[in-house]
Amino acid sequence: HSQQRLLREEVLSLTRQNGEYDMGKKKSKSIVAVVGRPNVGKSTLFNALAGENIAIVKDTPGITRDRIYADVSWLDRNFTLIDTGGIEPESKDIILSQMREQAQIAIDTADVIIFLVDVKQGLQDADSKVADMLRRSRKPVVLAVNKVDDFKKYMPDVYEFYNLGIGEPYPISATNRLGLGEFLDEVIAHFGQEVEEEEEDDRIRVAIIGKPNVGKSSIINRLIGENRLIVSDIAGTTRDAVDTEITHNGKEYVLIDTAGLRRKNKIKEELERYMIIRTVSAVERADIAVLIIGAVEGVTEQDAKIAGIAHDRGKAVIIAVNKWDAIEKDNQTVKEYTQKIRQVLSFMPYAEIMFISAVSGQRLMKLYDVIDAVNENHSMRVATGVLNEIVTEAVALQQPPSDKGKRLRIYYTTQVAVKPPTFVIFVNDKELMHFSYLRYLENQIRDTFGFVGTPLKFFVRERKDKK
């Protein structure tokens, strides 16, 4: 037992150093949006800050993504960086209207806004107009003056940007990564205290996500409408995903709605970007994502993009096929739909699938039961002794891989976090842990404990053989 305890402590200290998870305590992550005219270097800054952490480049199979958001860490503060930029327009009028649009998205969804300007182009009329908007929003704004690759030469030009009236301009060069430290210090200074959610907060936070026009609002209205016990619209939520508190069967839920403004004249690409930003903003604050898919259109690549946001962030996922009443059905229909969904969303085989109708109310209240079950799985802890029995049995059933005569040895497995359940497997040589064997172990653990609706995270750590 003492050896097991030592191993466990070793595992925990190793993984804490890596900061790869937060021991199951849910921290609310700040959202930082970048706004600026075309060609001031937004993408360069985005790449400089995000480094290798670009969530969008992560190879979740079956998904192509645009570089719209990324996870960034600075001085142990984690935040989600959003690039509000869109298509590069031609005329000055279009530039201004697009910048206003970007600024509005940032004001709607972000906690802190980075306003990026270009020292070489100097202060432009469009900069002043957008600065006015940002000032009125009362959101914290950090002004970054880009392309200052020679501080002595450009400092007089940097001071000109004080005229925008949004505080001190921070000189940076995104290309050469100059001045980023002080600038990032200022960004995270606006986060306030990093709030660890109170352990006693038993409310289940559910984001309702999906493409436009799949019936998200109707579903939320139904869920609220059948529950006359609406506690309140939570005050103080400044982001544009609207949170509503609900009590159902004595349990409390927070529904986070991403159903945004319908903008008829918007270009398709812009609508999609806007939808993704709103989804990131909502999913960040939820435990569970309910992905709504339209039954008539069926599952699409765009659904996969939205699902990928929840998957990358380790959220539990329920897939709800809405407008089920509008479909001609026979006894194969459910099976065919399920197969198609599993095929397009192949990266989340764990997700629960259900078929509902907001119009008729069909199976809509059952959604609460599924949310409860999935929430339980997302928060499940497995005792270390039991977990190691399962892994030992799995190893006996299927020998671990070997390379050049050296075989993988698994010493010990322990669960170190929940939401999602996170495990550390301690081995002699992590290079020997083949992806397919890890998948096999995951399947054995799932077969035993269920874990329906939630992703599982695994870290493989080395511990040199003491023999």
Predicted segments, located by residue:
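Cationic, low-complexity basic patches in intrinsically disordered or flexible, solvent-exposed regions
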Residues: 4-5, 21
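Conserved G1/Walker A P-loop phosphate-binding module
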Residues: 21-96, 192-276, 280-281
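Conserved nucleotide-binding/hydrolysis micro-motifs of P-loop NTPases
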Residues: 61-63, 86-88, 120-122, 147-152, ...
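Conserved C-terminal guanine-recognition region of P-loop GTPase G domains, centered on the G4
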Residues: 101-168, 277-350
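Canonical P-loop GTPase G-domain recognition
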Residues: 140-142, 149-199, 326-382
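Long, well-ordered amphipathic alpha-helical subdomains in the mid-to-C-terminal portions
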Residues: 207, 368-433, 439
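Short, non-transmembrane amphipathic alpha-helical segments
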Residues: 341, 437-451
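A short amphipathic beta-strand at an alpha->beta junction
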Residues: 450-465
